[in-house]
């Protein structure tokens, strides 16, 4: 039996969707092929890599990719992680389940270096908890 496809989308495929892909591969890889992409490709944010390393998940080999229409149309589940992606994401066929799980953009955090870093950690933990919940309950 082939695995289902889950596709995490955000604006730049730099932070949130990259962390979601990492957590998805960690929690969901037995049943799901996990991908991420963005409306634009801003490159992998080094703080996203650092934040994920703190929880033992290496995303340093992931790439920042634009949405691939064929993958979008063949996915079983598409998850938008920011309002911009939810608004601008191309239409998906009726058979593709689509949900919005909104998270703050850690790359836009303000304050001291430590305060900005705490936002990366918080968003990472929120994304991880949401994907773990999905892995455990299917919701």
Swiss-Prot record:
The active site is at 10 (nucleophile), 82 (nucleophile), 89 (nucleophile). GO terms for cellular component: cytoplasm. CDD domains: LMWP_ArsC. Its EC number is 1.20.4.4. Pfam families: LMWPc. It is an enzyme of class 1 (oxidoreductase). Keywords: Arsenical resistance, Cytoplasm, Disulfide bond, Oxidoreductase, Redox-active center. GO terms for molecular function: arsenate reductase (thioredoxin) activity; protein tyrosine phosphatase activity. It is found in: Cytoplasm. It comes from the Bacteria. It catalyses: arsenate + [thioredoxin]-dithiol + H(+) = arsenite + [thioredoxin]-disulfide + H2O. One of its GO terms (biological process) is response to arsenic-containing substance. HAMAP family: Arsenate_reduct. Catalyzes the reduction of arsenate [As(V)] to arsenite [As(III)]. Belongs to the low molecular weight phosphotyrosine protein phosphatase family. Thioredoxin-coupled ArsC subfamily. This is Arsenate reductase. It comes from Shouchella clausii (strain KSM-K16) (Alkalihalobacillus clausii).
């Amino acid at each position: 039996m082939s695995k289902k496809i889950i596709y995490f989308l955000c604006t730049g495929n730099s932070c949130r969707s990259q962390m979601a892909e990492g957590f998805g591969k960690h929690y969901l890889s037995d049943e799901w092929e996990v991908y991420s992409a963005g409306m634009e490709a801003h490159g992998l944010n080094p703080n996203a890599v650092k934040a994920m390393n703190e929880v033992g998940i290496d995303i340093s080999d992931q790439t920042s990719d634009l949405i691939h229409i064929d993958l979008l149309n063949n996915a079983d589940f598409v998850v938008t992680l920011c309002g911009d992606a939810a608004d601008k994401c191309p239409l998906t066929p009726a058979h593709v389940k689509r949900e919005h799980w909104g998270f703050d953009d850690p790359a836009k955090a303000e304050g001291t270096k430590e305060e900005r870093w705490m936002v990366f950690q918080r968003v990472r933990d929120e994304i991880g908890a949401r994907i773990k919940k999905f892995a455990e309950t299917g919701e």
